[in-house]
Amino acid sequence: LVNWTIINHVLDELPLPGYDRYQPGKGVWAPSIRWHDGKLWVCFSTPDEGIFICHTEDPWGKWSAPHCLRQARGWIDPCPFWDDNGQAWLVHAFAHSRSGIKHKLQLFAMAPDASELLGEGQIIYDGCCDLPTLEGPKVYQRAGWYYIFAPAGGVENGWQTVLRARQMTGPWEAKNVLFQGNTSINGPHQGGWVEGEKGECWFVHFQDLHLYGR
């Protein structure tokens, strides 16, 4: 988890109108990566167009063209999830700059082959009172519980929240588990839960450094 090498790119270009030019504040936001059915899946949003997904059987090889799961403005940070029983889901957040919402997570049932989102979504958590700027959800299943790791409070001074429930549709309970504390590393923001080969658990997240990026 310490030393990384770039081996490939999921997208050579973004095949959407206008992206042959520089587009500040647009483009690919907060992708998530998952392994299912012998394939790697990368799901991402473009905040003005919708939610897309790509897949490959070989991360060093060719990735599929981005497939649009749903056209929508202001839907961001999607995370697909395949349940142990074969049910597929997708959770996403909202961009306040496009939707006027910044504190809710929405859940969709998804076709198992990730070809489409099914039906209308449902809001599974509303952090209006306790979790402002709730975003970046990542979904996991462990020991009979479903977990959603999601940062709140904004990238500069926020914290990491974990939601858990016995079923994906809820009800979800929330606990704030990680704060900046006295360190100089702001955040912690939009991280992922990783379990090592020996069962040890790690949390990997980004740090916002303004002009230097994240």
Predicted regions: what they are:
Residues 1-214:
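Carbohydrate-active catalytic/glycan-binding domains of CAZyme proteins
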